[in-house]
């Protein structure tokens, strides 16, 4: 039996006023759970361009200033994902549901009060990363 292919995706931590943006998923995979904006690459796309595109497509938010955060290698029994994660602190626009077939809503959560039902593919790295962040943002 052949192993399934390794999937590579990008995710964006969108941070404002010590809050992080999560989308409530709908559909087959992860229905009812909360996740970061993100997705898969299009052919020929750079890491940064994929992250910017996914952020814009899913939320309507535009950011030209993403910071690389980390890469997570996440092999599981039936799937193997590599997550390439970015941070957006500088952005324009307000989060809106631009893909109603994928998301029910976008909501800001306090960094120390994350939702209980985080998407399984993100559970391993979201809380750990956010605990390490320190913000001084008094704009």
List each model region and its residues.
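Short, charged/polar surface micro-motifs in flexible loops or helix N-caps
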Residues: 15-20, 29, 42-43, 88-94
